[in-house]
A protein has these predicted regions:
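Hydrophobic transmembrane alpha-helices of multi-pass small-molecule transporters
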Residues: 65-68, 180-184, 210-214, 285-288, ...
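Interfacial/gating helices of multi-pass transporter permease domains
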Residues: 44-64, 130-135, 195-196, 236-243, ...
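Residue-level signal for short hydrophobic patches within transmembrane helices
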Residues: 12, 16-35, 39, 62-69, ...
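Short alpha-helical transmembrane segments in multi-pass integral membrane proteins
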Residues: 1-23, 81-146, 190-245, 301-366, ...
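Transmembrane helical elements of multi-pass membrane transporters/channels
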Residues: 21-40, 142, 153, 176, ...
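Helix-terminus/linker motif at the lipid-water interface of multi-pass membrane proteins
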Residues: 31, 35-53, 123-130, 186-193, ...
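Short runs within selected transmembrane alpha-helices of multi-pass transporters and secretion channels
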Residues: 74, 142-161, 169-177, 198-211, ...
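Small-residue-rich hydrophobic transmembrane alpha-helices
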Residues: 53-113, 150-169, 275-333, 337-339, ...
Length: 448
């Protein structure tokens, strides 16, 4: 298969420059994707009520559980397509493209049905306070009504990135984000629709981004999407699931542990809930950077592993580790120093700001310790091994967090005891990943 410019940019050239050239569009896209919920949070917090802000915040872990598993499933298609593309296997790219898009449509419908039907029940299980429950239930019902568009967009963006195109997904997100802001102002501020308006604005913007990338794939010259070619290839589906199911389970385990933590946060009342919501939005940049490096290394390793450029795989790990740790370290320092100023963007309630500032001071300084987890997990998946990173994360992070919440937090019931479970599990998981990579994956790359 004739390789396009985008592929050459990933499999050839100075590694740190090529990774950054791929990383920045992903980061920008992640930023605008995060802006969906951030704009909702700011407008709901300032123009509706503190209870509405808490209601939107408490739905986060639940939304992530539903979306996480099925998005993880879809990531299997992205990894396989990147390997086919790097190897120059045109038929493999075509088959993965059509199987992946079909899978995203089916999964999107499933998420929509499950989310609308089970979302409110799950919120009750999370001990959502009575003064927030109705608004939170309304938000998740409207949000999950747009699950099909969200799932389709994520698959489309992953496919384009796997082929080295990280720019057009960003363009679609910029347009969608602008649509989201306008619709938030119209529906929440203008029409006074409250949390339902915020959720509906997000759904509309997701539809816009999904349609834009659908048009891009249909018009792609080298590897176009053909509606007549949509369908599931069983053999390819098994390969996708072999990578995607463990990735999805990992995200679910992460989000289940976060849901348990959210349940603990809920037990402290609406003020702490609002503070936690504001903190998570404040800390979003850290995880946007982390996630962008994770996507970049997965795609980079996938293409270079498929092209048998194992030397570049090894070097990319070192480069991404250095850049991610350095970047997140600087962000964490700035966030800790200016935490009250940043929190003031989301709310004017002084008690919420002070509690949020305390949460940041406990968690954020340790964020860089999670970067080895992101980089090594992405590397392993790019090489086609999704089970091992899933097992490491589930045991080192999720299980430990659950045990911590059920023992230490239950016994002492302080905000400090709840917050420390994050840095504690980050450090533990990073150590396990470093040892696993050095003992198992590094020798494999050197052997071939």
């Amino acid at each position: 298969m004739k390789r396009g410019t985008a592929t050459k940019q990933i499999t050839e050239g100075v590694i740190w420059k090529q990774i950054l050239a791929f990383f920045f569009p992903i980061l920008l896209g992640t930023f605008f994707q995060q802006m969906y919920n951030t704009v909702d949070t700011i407008i709901v917090g300032r123009f509706v009520s503190t209870q509405a802000l808490a209601a939107v915040g408490t739905t986060g872990p639940l939304v992530n559980i539903f979306n996480g598993f099925f998005t993880g499933l879809g990531s299997g298609a992205t990894v396989i397509l990147a390997q086919f593309y790097g190897a120059g296997n045109k038929q493999g790219v075509r088959d993965t493209l059509h199987t992946g898009v079909t899978l995203s449509l089916l999964l999107g419908l499933l998420i929509m049905v499950l989310g609308i039907g089970l979302g409110p029940v799950a919120l009750k299980w999370m001990h959502t306070p009575a003064d927030c429950l109705d608004m939170a239930s309304l938000y998740v019902r409207v949000y999950f009504a747009g699950a099909l568009a969200s799932m389709l967009y994520n698959m489309e963006a992953g496919i384009l990135r796997a082929m080295g195109d990280s720019q057009r997904p960003v363009i679609s997100l910029i347009v969608a984000c602008l649509v989201n802001i306008v619709m938030d102002l119209v529906l929440v501020v203008g029409l006074k629709m409250g949390v339902a308006g915020a959720a509906l604005a997000t759904v509309i913007s997701q539809v816009v981004s999904a349609v834009m990338l659908l048009v891009v794939l249909l018009r792609e010259k080298e590897n176009p999407l053909e509606l007549s070619g949509l369908g599931i290839q069983p053999k390819l589906l098994r390969r996708i699931l072999a990578i995607g199911v463990p990735a999805g389970l990992q995200l679910v385990m992460f989000d289940l542990s976060n849901t348990l933590i959210q349940s603990g946060i809920n037990s402290f009342g609406s003020t702490v809930m609002a503070s936690w919501t504001a903190y998570t939005k404040t800390d979003a940049l850290t995880w946007m950077v982390s996630g962008a490096f994770g996507v970049a290394i997965t795609t980079f390793v996938g293409q270079n592993y498929g092209a048998h450029r194992y030397d570049r795989v090894r070097q990319s790990v070192r480069v991404c580790l250095a850049m991610s740790i350095g970047t997140v370290g600087v962000i964490s320092l700035l966030m800790t120093v200016f935490r009250r100023v940043i929190l003031g963007v989301y709310t004017t309630d002084t008690s919420v700001i002070e509690t949020g500032a305390y949460i940041i001071s406990v968690i954020v300084p340790f964020a860089a310790t999670f970067m080895p987890v992101e980089i090594f997990a992405g590397t392993m998946r790019g090489m086609g091994d999704s089970m091992r990173p899933t097992a490491i994360i589930c045991l080192s992070v999720c299980v430990v967090r659950v045990l911590w919440i059920m023992t230490a937090v239950k016994k002492y019931h302080t905000l400090l005891m709840l917050c420390v479970c994050y840095p504690m599990t980050w450090v533990l998981c990073a150590i396990v990943f470093i040892v696993t990579y050095l003992r198992t994956f590094r020798p494999r790359l050197e052997a071939v």
